[in-house]
Amino acid sequence: PEASLDRLREGFPLETYRWIVWGRPRPVEAEPVPETLTLTNGTTLRPLPAPGYADDMVCYLAEDHGLLFAADLYITPQPQYLRFDENAPRLIESIHEVLAHDFETVLCAHRGVVEAGRRALSEKVKYMEALRGVVQRRYRYDKVTVPQITDEILGREGLLYWISGGDFSKRNLIASCLDDVPDRTGKIMG
C-alpha cells in the first residue's frame, strides 16, 4: 500500500527480538501495489488489503485457481498471542472481507499450504469473535481486569512474552479484544 512506501524507502525501527531473529530490513525502493498482478504463467493476482496484524498487510487472490496467498492472516486457527501493535477487531473484519471472495486453498506464510483454507479461516474468525465476546463480557459486566482475564482464558505468559519484552503476549490479545470498548470511565480503550 501507498502508506508503506516511505517505511520501505527510509527504514523503520524494529524491536530487539525481531531484528535478532530476522535481521534488520534494508531500505528498498518500492512501487504501489497495482490493481492486479499477472504472473509469467498468466495467473492474475488481485491484492486484498487485510490490516490487523499490520496496518499495511495485503493478501493476494488467484481466483481462477481458488488460491489465497494469505500473508499473516491465517497463521493459526486459535491465536494465543498478539504483538502490541496488532488489532484483533480489525483482524476479524479483514478475515470477513477476505472470506467474501472465492477461494478454497490458503497459502500461509507460516503454515504452508492449507488445503481447506476457507474453512480454516472461518474457524479462526469464529474463535476470535467468541474470544472477543467472552473478554468483553468479563471486562464490562464482571469487572474483571485484563491480567485476570488473560490468566483465566489463556493462562500465564510463557517464554514468548519474556523473549519479546512483552511485545508478543497473551495479554496483548486480550487487551486488543477491548479496543473498541469504553473503559470504566467511558474512554474508548486501545
Per-range role (PLM):
Residues 50, 60, 72, 91, ...:
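Divalent metal-coordination and catalytic microenvironments
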Residues 1-2, 49-52, 68-71, 105-111:
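Active-site neighborhood of phospho(di)ester-bond hydrolases with catalytic His/Asp-centered motifs
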Residues 137-190:
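C-terminal regulatory/interaction regions
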Residues 5-7, 54-57, 75-78, 111-116:
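Active-site environment of divalent metal-dependent phosphoester hydrolases
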Residues 89-143:
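Divalent-metal (often Zn2+) His-rich catalytic cores of metallo-beta-lactamase-fold enzymes
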Residues 12, 80-85, 119-120:
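Short, solvent-exposed loop/turn segments at secondary-structure boundaries
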Residues 1-40:
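Active-site HxH/HxHxD metal-binding segment of metal-dependent hydrolases
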Residues 35-62:
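Core dinuclear metal-dependent hydrolase active-site scaffold
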